[in-house]
Amino acid sequence: MLLTGLLCGILLGFVMQRGRFCITGAFRDMYVTKNNKMFIALLLAITVQSIGFFLLKEIGVLNVDPAENFAFLAVIIGAFVFGLGIVLAGGCATGTWYRAAEGLVGSWVALFNYMLLSAIMRTGPLGEFNKTLRNINIEQRNIYDTFGISPWWLVALLTFVTAFYVYKHLSKPSVKVAALKPKKTGLAHLLFEKRWHPFFSAVLIGLIALAAWPLSVATGREFGLGITGPSANIMQFLVTGDGKFINWGVFLVLGIFIGSFIGAKASNEFRVRVPDATTILRSGLGGILMGIGATLAGGCSIGNGLVETAFFSWQGWVSLPLMILGTWVAAYFTIIRPQRLKLAKAS
């Protein structure tokens, strides 16, 4: 059953790579370019998973309550720090995995540091610090339990909001994007050459995230998609050789790398690219902040931003805006401010 994690990861990695589904870009673009398309796509993926998750619970296929007590201080600090990190690293947790598979050396550095710090924050020197902050919590887990309502009210609200923004975006006049003459035909063109619409990718990602639940639960791991814990587990296994660290999630992230590599190679997008020293250092720092932040927050942009939000945990919906805020702050200092200084000098 663990191999289903590998299959799920291959599908997810392939879809994210080919769809250029970047959560860092979704957060950053809302501020830098005032473009909400990728964030709407994220909402669509959350909605698809949320509807399916509660349907599976309703019919008895899933019998899990994955939400934990709300560690508010750790979530607030961690989500913000993670948001800073993903801008410096040039991609979120999953984005860093799939960009590493495309041959970006900066992403290799970010990924290594992300995995290392995630492990250090769990069982290493920073383990007690993480545990202390995570233990400052309140016994509130899900938003619908706190307010004593059915989760279906929140599902309906999320569906309405998402449908409104999807419709609003699709109603805008389409802008033709210049493209080279296709070299492939048929299925090969659709899979490896044609530009995928973010909403199409989002629906596929939502369905993969939904499928992850019963597949993962069947192995004893009561959660869906998750990147930070499995990434830390790989590092811990490599250091200790202890097989207890190998679970469904580890196969998932390895599959993401494989699927992304397949997508990049087949579409001629794989190329080893070595950035300058400044970018390497920035990517390394970004990976460190990602590992610390995601562990404190209890999840990354996938675990918290895509999955925890789908079952309406406080952790998910508090971490999401904090990750966005961290992204915007980092974008200001790395993109907006340098541009303004350059314009001021030119004038």
Regions from the PLM with identified roles:
Residues 1-347:
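Membrane-interfacial helix-loop segments of redox and metal-homeostasis proteins
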